[in-house]
């Protein structure tokens, strides 16, 4: 894998040499706009690197980057504009922004690491110490679990909870056999093991097939 830093995104000879190697490429885009990103991608691809082997990282080249300058949604703009894998190179303080980037779909996270934030140099204060790095990785792994498959359906625990959380049509009062079900003698209560309240209109006006006690589940 070759990592192209933000400062080299306009270095045509360098981009050509990397492209000719036909390896996986991670391209950082700090200080650049969409046109500069397009030019860099065109050079890499024309030189021989497959588009599917390129990941473009949104980045704010500022140490530390202020939250209001991060513009994390630009990562999605890059993804949608170039139909390419994206990630995020972070220079903000803390671990919140990389976690948010992972939630938005970043496939790569770059974060600087330091043993001492007080060391000389521009990026130590925006870097993570060992404990923070471990916390960030745990959080991102949790986010990966949370993303799911995108299909809206009840989870297995939710399926088990349906019976006690949802509701059924029940007798509001004692109901005698032959009595007509109406809004004055039926109600909606837990548990959800009887007739769904979504069938309310089809129950109203029907005759009771037997006697029902107050709060008993209605059966047709």
Where on the chain are the PLM-derived regions?
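Catalytic cores and adjacent flexible loops of soluble metabolic enzymes
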Residues: 1-220
